[in-house]
Every structure is written in C-alpha cells, then in structure tokens.
Amino acid sequence: MSIELKKVSKRFVDNVVLDGVDFFVAEKETVALLGPSGTGKSVLLKHIIGLIKPDSGEVWVDGQQVPLLGRKELAALRSRIGYVFQNGALFDSMDVFENIRLGISDEEKYADKEYCIQRVRECLRLVNLNEEVGRKFPSELSGGMRKRVGISRAIAGKPTYLLYDEPTSGLDPVNADVIDSLIERLQEEIGVTSVVVTHDVRGAFRVADRIALLSKAKIRAVGTAEEIIASRDPVVQQFLERDLEMAVIQANEVPTTERRIGGR
C-alpha cells in the first residue's frame, strides 16, 4: 500500500526534470511534494500513475513496478488511484453528478443508477457540498467549488491512493484554507495514502505528515514540518522565506471581512 520511487531520472530533450530521485510514501501517510513551479512535481505524479516512464530507476506502487505493467494490470492499478487535477478537469458538457460519476471505475457499479446516486451524494457530502450542486454545470461553479467537485470525483471510486496536483492553485487564501481543511478531513475519514503536489508551504505544513522539497531535479530535503523549518540547507531556507513573503502579500490582498470569515 506504499508508493516508492528509487533513483528515478527523467529528461525531455536537454531538460533534466528528475535526477536520481528517491521518494517514499508509507501506507495511509500524506506526503507533500513542495517546490517552485516548473521543477518536475507534476512529472513525478505522472510517473506514479504510469502516464510517464522513467529513463532510469524504479517506480513502485502497491507492490508493483509501474513501468513494467501491461495494459490490464495498469488499468487495475489506476482504478485504485484517485487523481485531483490542477484545473479540476471537469467536462463542461456534463453536470456535476455525471462528472463525479465518471470517478466510479467499477463497471457494474457505474451501470447501477441507484448506487451511483447514493455514491455521488456521499462524495458531495465528504467535500461539504449539498446534493443540489449535482444538477449544476461546471460553468455555474466558483473556482473553489470546481476544486471540491474535482476532489469528489477523485474519491468516487473509493481509491487506496490520492494524488493531488496543486489543489489550491489559483485560489485566494480563504478558499485555499477550505481545500486544505478538506484534505485533512478526508485523510481522517477515508484513510488513503496521499501525495500532495504544491508550491504552498503553509498548506503543505498543515496537511502533510512529511514534506519533500524538489529543487533542480533533485529531492533536496525530506522531513516533518519541524525538521524542514530547522534545516540549514540554504535552498530550503530560501524557499521558505520566499513563501512567507508571498503569504504576507496574499493576506494583504484579501478583504478584511474575508480574513475574519476564514479565521472563524
């Protein structure tokens, strides 16, 4: 039930994205993968789900080496993985109910209309949305609601693993806090093994058991929030300081009334 990358390297033409990366997530653990934009965090996620194969190294998920799996075995593995896309990746031509239903990977359950109705309702409840939202279309939703619907779809198939690709990207601090709270609560309620890719240090410290910092194609540091803060690595400290400055800027951009609501 674990995820492990061993000495994984990947390059695209002359661009080295991952260089001998070791990365481990224990069963029911949440690990946040931090790093600036464009450093290969999403590429690492795509290795886990088998969308990209490494140039060298090994990718293990659920006791299986992902790059060596055949089509059927890979499909079976993916059915146990929920993927939360950065932009939500909702189908605009489908209402919320049908978008979430797509996350039900079991063909028999997908064909059972009553099961789907009950499962979609449960998934909406888990992300703090009422069932009336199921009749809306993505164009009628706010950015924060679209993110929650994306998470709801990712958990619809009752996954063993959850992969979040920048779940709070593009959200103001208030809505980002809502998503972070949701990730925390889902971990408590459904107990999955999770990887949260983000550039938001504050959110990572909140939701993760451990944090890994990816910089210049390598894992620069791994540890608890306290261990990362205590690191004397200048790259780690520079990243933390830059994020703190950004947090102050964002806080000043949020209206006072919203900051009060978020702090309740």
Regions found by a protein language model. Give the residues of each.
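Conserved catalytic motifs of ABC-family nucleotide-binding domains
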Residues: 158
